[in-house]
């Protein structure tokens, strides 16, 4: 049994922050941000962001394009590291879109989350467990940023992307590879804050609060530039497809310098990489499905083309998927 991508969808907040606006908050400039990251503006909410509502808008967009009712979905997988509820927001998403017949759960793998979620969804379909699965990658990074840290606050934006997949006699997912190295976890993390505590009898119990994102940019850059080309090449080798036979590469939209370095290591022109980083910033788990949806809207991706998706991020985790677009 194969897996077919039925439709895609996306959603972003309706407020953008231009690079120049950061100059009033921190010591930086539009030139510094754009040359080092490729970002020209980020998308942030005017009010308190709702992960669930962003995810629901992307999900409904995908459902509408496929002319499928939410009640017909068997499973929802929400890839996010910033849920509205610490226990997970997939159930809230299920309720929001009215997918009352579906099972729903979250996957937390930061910027690799969508890749892992899509692979997980495909396994359920290939096993014959479910017929239609909705995969959503969504993050509201704005609420976990230290806005005084210029190394990280300029990078992130909020957004959501969705992919609806179903069973088919033809398999659109040709192969995949997933990787993790927990020894590198400290390079990118959002940890529990030990500063708050409460007294319980003779015991002091920490309160459940978290710090802001902390990132070692140099180490993350080295990790991504080294590991991502390897996992892409290995994945392509497994399905007997050469780099030259790939029509498009859609990578996690982290930083333009990372994407340029990966393109160089793969010996491919940057024009083969679909990017939207300059308009949204790093939207974490949303970045790949958001870029995929835009590429389809713009008719860049055509039937029969080979597309490589690759994510990398906190964990540290990374992975790749090879698609044959149908």
Swiss-Prot record:
Where are the residues of the annotated region ACP-binding? 253-257
Q: Which GO terms describe its biological process?
A: fatty acid biosynthetic process
The gene it comes from is fabH
- Pathway info: Lipid metabolism; fatty acid biosynthesis
Protein name as it appears in the record:
Beta-ketoacyl-[acyl-carrier-protein] synthase III
State the Pfam families in the record.
ACP_syn_III, ACP_syn_III_C
Whose protein is this, by species? Porphyra umbilicalis (Purple laver)
What does the UniProt function comment say about this protein? Catalyzes the condensation reaction of fatty acid synthesis by the addition to an acyl acceptor of two carbons from malonyl-ACP. Catalyzes the first condensation reaction which initiates fatty acid synthesis and may therefore play a role in governing the total rate of fatty acid production. Possesses both acetoacetyl-ACP synthase and acetyl transacylase activities. Its substrate specificity determines the biosynthesis of branched-chain and/or straight-chain of fatty acids.
| UniProt keyword annotations, A-Z | Acyltransferase, Chloroplast, Fatty acid biosynthesis, Fatty acid metabolism, Lipid biosynthesis, Lipid metabolism, Multifunctional enzyme, Plastid, Transferase
